[in-house]
Swiss-Prot record:
Primary gene name: recF
Pfam entry (one): SMC_N
Cystine bridges: none
Annotated organism of origin: Chlamydia abortus (strain DSM 27085 / S26/3)
Molecular function via GO: ATP binding; single-stranded DNA binding
Name of the molecule in the record: DNA replication and repair protein RecF
Amino acid sequence: MNILSLRLKNFRNYKEAEVSLSPNINYIFGENAQGKTNLIEALYVLSLGRSFRTSHLTEAIFFGSSYFFLEMTFEKDGVPHTLSTYVDKHGKKIFCDQSPIKTLSQLIGMIPIVLFSAKDRCLIAGAPSDRRLFLNLLLSQCDPQYKHSLSYYHRALLQRNTLLKTKQTSTLSVWDEQLATLGSYLCLSRYTCCAQLNQLIQTLWNNSLSERLFIKFKSSLIKQCKISQEAVKNELHKQLTASLHRDLELGNTSVGPHREDFTLMINDLPVAQFSSEGQKHSLLAVLKLAESLYIKSLHNVYPLFCMDDIHAGLDNQRISQLLGLAPSLGQTLITSTTLPHQTLSEANRIFSVNQAQISIHSHAIIK
């Protein structure tokens, strides 16, 4: 799968722009606030139906305009397709090959994408909800059943919480059964995902200090090393029953996958407390590379790999390592304030961005 071109209209600081992309590395450089990150954001919105910078897509509309329009052409299994998103104050419309996409479940996974940016610091120091979102987006791009289970789990959770707030307990058992069935699939999927990410991290994390980097998944539902969905379902059902009195007092559900979390660890110590800022950024880069390889292992296609502001927090040695890995990661977009310090082959493309004007800097080898 390759994205062939991207078109933007009334998006952020772009009144209108179009860019053709290389199937390999696309290196985009320019001063700050010129529109580099906006290109990655546009691809993210097209791929996932949401932004990584705002929860309100209308904030991305060009000043003075009433809408924005994004369109990409991409090739999948040798067949060209068009995907577009239109947003105005009334809502969002998404089309693939002129056919409407009515739900995000239909969209997510069509164009798998991995983003590495400064906002990923939340995976170390942010709230548990940030880390659950990371797993939810990753698994939703790979597993249609996970998307379905997640959607229906939150619906059932909302219904149960409504009953708890109004002290209506007569039908709670119905929702407990749904939560246990759906929640067990979510929990087991996350547990398995973290285990597989850890294997990939160990392959990627290579340093002279022999430090061990891994994800520690935290769930009250995991009671033993060898688990099954039935065992997790029974455990969640038991915990929902045991916490009923407390839940009635709180007016919400205190146990389940919506309370799960994970911690990035290095040598059995939390990265958040025992790593330098530069080391944290390097560790996150490894996690994001593992995320890309995880999607490849399930999709049999590399996701679009985006690295925003690559020089923020990474030294030249680590950047060189990332760029060395990039050709084996499929199509990649990188933004930076400077030109690369190492050679990029003719198969790649370098763009400069200045005041929302995109130009091809060179197709040639740069040293």
